[in-house]
Regions:
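Short, well-structured alpha-helical interface segments that form or flank functional binding sites
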Residues: 12, 58, 100, 182, ...
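Short N-terminal signal/transit or membrane-insertion segments
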Residues: 1-5, 18, 25, 113-132
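Catalytic cores of phosphodiester-bond-cleaving enzymes
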Residues: 47-119
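Short, surface-exposed, charged/polar-biased interaction segments
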Residues: 24-27, 35, 39, 83-87, ...
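C-terminal, charged low-complexity interaction regions
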Residues: 124-204
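An N-terminal structural lobe/cap that precedes and organizes the functional/catalytic core
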Residues: 1-73
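Short loop/turn segments at secondary-structure transitions that flank enzyme active sites
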Residues: 9, 69, 111, 193, ...
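Surface-exposed beta-strand edges and their flanking turn/coil or helix-capping segments
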Residues: 27-30, 120, 200-202
């Protein structure tokens, strides 16, 4: 297995898909069975229960060098602003912090893909992972939104991920999802809502 971000076959790490420091921000959220749901267009929804804390979820798709290097530095850079926003604390966000949060959002959603989706890599190409690993900034053709979340649900986190496929309006919608042209993801943590839209429109 090679690292999704750099392609290295070096030692792989157990990367936490969400930072461990999120856990203490939710002291009332104890170990429970959390739900992963999968659904393709027209298919029946499939739910999977996973025991344990969602903040303890790890994946082995990234190498030690990436995980302990630039990925760790990005977490530290984003932490001050993220912590305030997750806890619904009033604060301003500088232009630099906005870029940092957008980059962190992209990294986290790409990391969540293999962990939360049975076929996560189908919706995000290898080239997309490599581009982000090299440039470490929001993806080309992407839009990042940040907002205050007031869902009031019992879960401190919620993640939704959808592949996007374009087709000419004079053709029927494809019945089988093959390669996609992009994705849309929404991640809510505490009172923070993050939305990422990324696509490339095919020619013809």
């Amino acid at each position: 297995m090679s690292c999704l971000f750099c392609g290295s076959f070096g030692p792989m790490s157990r990367e936490h898909v969400l930072p461990k420091w999120f856990g203490p921000l939710f002291p009332d959220f104890r170990e429970v069975d959390y739900v992963r749901a999968f659904q393709r267009t027209g298919d029946e929804r499939i739910n999977h229960l996973r025991p344990g804390m969602a903040f303890d979820q790890t994946v082995r798709h990234f190498c030690l060098e990436c995980n302990n290097g630039w990925m760790s530095r990005l977490e530290e850079q984003a932490k001050p602003a993220l912590e305030s926003l997750v806890l619904d604390e009033e604060r301003s966000i500088s232009a630099v912090e906005q870029l940092t949060i957008a980059t962190w959002m992209t990294k986290t959603i790409l990391t969540l893909g293999p962990a939360m989706l049975e076929e996560g890599r189908e919706f995000v190409t290898e080239e997309t992972y490599r581009w982000f690993g090299e440039h470490r900034m929001p993806l080309p053709g992407s839009i990042c939104w940040l907002g205050r979340y007031t869902g009031g649900e019992e879960w401190p986190i919620s993640f939704h991920f959808h592949g996007i496929q374009f087709y000419p309006e004079d053709q029927e919608r494809p019945q089988v999802v093959g390669s996609t042209h992009g994705f849309h993801a929404v991640l809510a943590i505490g009172n923070l809502a993050l939305c990422l839209f990324c696509c490339s429109i095919p020619e013809g």
